[in-house]
Amino acid sequence: MRKLSRRQNENLKKIKNVVHSSLEEAITLLQDTATAKFIESVELHANLNIDTKYADQQLRTTVTLPHGIGKSMRIAVLTNEANFNEANEGGADIVGSQELIDDISQGNLNFDLLVATPDMMPKLAKLGRVLGPKGLMPSPKSGTVSTNLTETLSDFKKGKFEYKADKTGVVHVNFGKANFSKDQLMENLTSLYQSIEQNRPSGVKGKYFKSLFICTSMGPSIQLDLNTFD
């Protein structure tokens, strides 16, 4: 077994395996355990009572957090030439048509998000093997297939992003950086929790949340009481 570092041992002593009902106390502890030599991301890990092999128990949606997540997103837009100006003026970092498809097919994925107009989707079908594993395939559900590029780009530039439950029914998602203010992290986390709650799959029976943990990129997990947001 790998020996824990001094920093890790000190952080484990801080959390004391307590389940926190106070969001403010949990966020304070979260920031106190952000002791790495870089600015750590902060994460929510929500274990949900869902079985994602059933269509009515899948969770995949988008959210815009009040204070973003501290990351600038590089956005590519795949559309026809008639929409190039709108995409460029909307703040797209890459705009293209067939030439962008060719780049993607060669594995050039120098973007964090791909937005496409509906007319380009048939041409993207053959690139599912390239884009799918990276989570970059545009879809109407994620808001990345759109005819209104101006609005779509504005939303994503403001921090809108997609999240989903994995095969085990757990949502792993960043909600900011450890150097955000306590209030910013509390507001972001509350908004994220509310988004998960509001998008509860129709097939869920009984309680929805099984457990909630927050942590920094390199820090220990801090458990939240399931009634923290009530």
UniProtKB/Swiss-Prot annotation:
GO terms for molecular function: rRNA binding; structural constituent of ribosome. This is Large ribosomal subunit protein uL1c. Binds directly to 23S rRNA. Might be involved in E site tRNA release (Potential). CDD domains: Ribosomal_L1. Keywords: Chloroplast, Plastid, Ribonucleoprotein, Ribosomal protein, RNA-binding, rRNA-binding. GO terms for cellular component: chloroplast; large ribosomal subunit. Belongs to the universal ribosomal protein uL1 family. InterPro entries: Ribosom_uL1_bac-type (IPR005878), Ribosomal_uL1 (IPR002143), Ribosomal_uL1-like (IPR023674), Ribosomal_uL1/biogenesis (IPR028364), Ribosomal_uL1_3-a/b-sand (IPR016095), Ribosomal_uL1_CS (IPR023673). It comes from the Eukaryota. GO terms for biological process: translation. The gene is rpl1. PANTHER family: 54S RIBOSOMAL PROTEIN L1, MITOCHONDRIAL, LARGE RIBOSOMAL SUBUNIT PROTEIN UL1M. It is found in: Plastid, Chloroplast. Part of the 50S ribosomal subunit. Pfam families: Ribosomal_L1 (PF00687). Its main location: plastid.
